[in-house]
């Protein structure tokens, strides 16, 4: 499930909300992917990102392998205000650290989410559905474990926040509901039948209803927020994760939510895989008729 690799990019994006008054030393330039790949492949990186490893240990290793990172790492360790390339590099290293340390945990969390069949029922409205309620309870447990703020908006939207120092918020929109399952579509080329609600690894892919759309995103964001919080990087804006429960069936839950609260001024949508999403403001249908000639 390639979306799990978004954790590095996402954490960097969240960290970029860090306040940036006048500041510390500047590095020689932003660290690039080849350098990050070299750090990730180092045997010592495994120890630095093990259960007992810390972000500071990982930064020390990174500065040892890439000496030009040393000023940014030193500024971070003395809690100086970061800006420019220093901020970019610490953010990117935090993303890499999060991916190496938490990837297995993200997959495990995604598996737990996939196991909850949050398909819309014809018998009860979504906000009364036991599976939607169970999903909210799972998110609440993770949020509390990670030291994040949680709010359940009447089982319509589950909200998780990482507070920043300023009044502004940055929103991340996701959804927990999934489309119905067609059993014939869950068969591999060799005839193996898959359980849609059991996350299954086949080669380098993970199969499960909602693994991409959109439960893998939710698990990834939660661990990204956890990593940012534990890093101690100061946020200028509050990060607000919003988990809608009716996205696949009209979005009534988001309408309810908007009547109850104010959306952040800036939001990103993590929904399946798109090259770019500027905004999703609604949907429509075009009907046309054409004369036919025999």
Residue ranges and their predicted role:
Residues 1-4:
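Positively charged n-region of N-terminal signal peptides that target proteins for export
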Residues 11-12:
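Repetitive helical segments and hydrophobic/amphipathic motifs
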Residues 15-16:
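C-terminal motif of bacterial Sec signal peptides marking the signal peptidase cleavage site
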Residues 21-34:
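Short, low-complexity, disordered segments immediately C-terminal to signal peptides
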Residues 42-43, 47, 55-58, 62-206, ...:
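Acidic/His- and Gly-rich active-site-bordering loop/insert found
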Residues 163-167, 273, 291-294:
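Short loop segments at secondary-structure junctions
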Residues 203-212, 275:
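A short glycine/serine-rich beta->alpha loop
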Residues 214-290:
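Acidic/histidine-rich catalytic neighborhood of metal-dependent amide-processing enzymes
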